[in-house]
Every structure is written in structure tokens, then in C-alpha cells.
Amino acid sequence: MGTPAPAPTEGATVVTIVHAPACHFCADAQRTLAELARDFPLRVELLDWAEPRGERLVRDHRAPMYPLVLLDGVLFSSGRLPRRKLARLLATRVATVGA
């Protein structure tokens, strides 16, 4: 059937990236997430678009561009990763958990 989604790590946001070969937006998203992981609790899961689960996620979310990015299983973006929007969302999540 395919690889199941990872279970969230306590307090960490699970970020799933479905990437494609030679995708510069995909490489940029991975670099951005590595930087954000220094400030926020993240668990990053990389899936190739050709893997059964990657294909299913792209089909289910009708992603027109790569990378497809999900946060805790919910669609966040497709194509260029909106860095500031993601950082604001992660900051809000951390503040909410810490409150």
C-alpha cells in the first residue's frame, strides 16, 4: 500500500516535501527548512514524486508544481515555498504550544 505518514514528534511540526528531479524550488525548500529547523521543532519527510505515496499525495492535492509541501498532513504550498508565511505559522504554533 505505501509508506504511512510519520507520526508527529512531540511538539514538532511534520513537514512532508514531495520533490521531483532537477527541481530548483525543491532544493530551495529543503535549504529553507534546514534553516528553519534551527529555530523551530520540525520533522522533515522527503518523498520522491515517483514513490507510490508521493504520487498519491500529488494526485490527492492536485499539485500543479513541485515541491508539494504539507504541514502535519495538511496542504501548505505547491511550487516556491513561501518562507515568511511558513516562519510566521511556525512561530504561531510554538507560541500556542508554549502558552
Task: Name the predicted role of every residue range.
Residues 60-69:
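Structural micro-motif
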